[in-house]
């Protein structure tokens, strides 16, 4: 029996795809990047040449309809995620869509309906849950190394963007709620919120507040919120993008110990309990999405369960909307 090959077509060829994700599609067994689409003809030709991709398109629908392609990777800004995903599903293609999955809960529900009404599969690129670093944290929790988790304290802070940075096309769209959903918070927080859902499961209640403090751009730049999980764990999170120093800190406090780690900076995981202190370090991944892409390819081939479903993406969108008052 011939093994199924996942032939990818990629819609969008921006900065995130250059190293984080794009090359990994060619390195995963049973996977190859067959085509790429970008509206700028010269840029898409250059991208295809540099990454040894045999086909290129300037029209997304033509890429979707290519009979050789059986899976679509959507790496555009979030305002078009659901548009391309629904079109791909209607064409019978499997879909791997970048985070945030869409712009709102309503659009997430429409995408979920499209998944259920078509044969194609869909996975969301909440890729940190497949990285060894975060799988280790999940294992430590499952092994009850800190007893029953009681509270999560997450703090995230970035320095304000410079005027030059705000004019950079790679950043500018992230600051427009119409394209990104809600600024830098919507760009980064999906990773953090998804990990909490991955670690702790069903969410019972969410409350939050967001505000535009600095007025540097349209989107809010400070967010604070709480999440109550079904297991009675309480999450407290704060995000600011106008700080004098950068902070990337998360603590999970249990009845018998504490786990401390970072979501983005790769600091060693620190475990403190009655047995003393332990530290766990991991090498940085060259292609940060490769473990997730391996899992998605296996799912599309029918070899495992979905590593991150549309329903899980919907739960993250519900939290993002609740924290920002949408």
PLM feature spans:
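C-terminal helix-rich "cap/oligomerization" subdomain common to oxidoreductases
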Residues: 1-5, 31, 71-73, 109, ...
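Short, conserved SAM-binding/catalytic segment
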Residues: 46-53, 111-115
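Conserved SAM-binding strand-loop segment of SAM-dependent methyltransferases
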Residues: 53-60
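Beta-strand-loop-alpha-helix segment that lines the small-molecule cofactor/substrate pocket
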Residues: 71-78, 82-129, 144
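C-terminal glycine/acidic-rich active-site capping loop/insertion
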Residues: 127, 249-321
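Predominantly a Rossmann-like dinucleotide-binding segment in NAD(P)-dependent oxidoreductases
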Residues: 128-209, 213-215
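Contiguous beta-strand/loop segments that form the cofactor/metal-binding neighborhood of enzyme cores
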Residues: 187, 193-266, 293-304
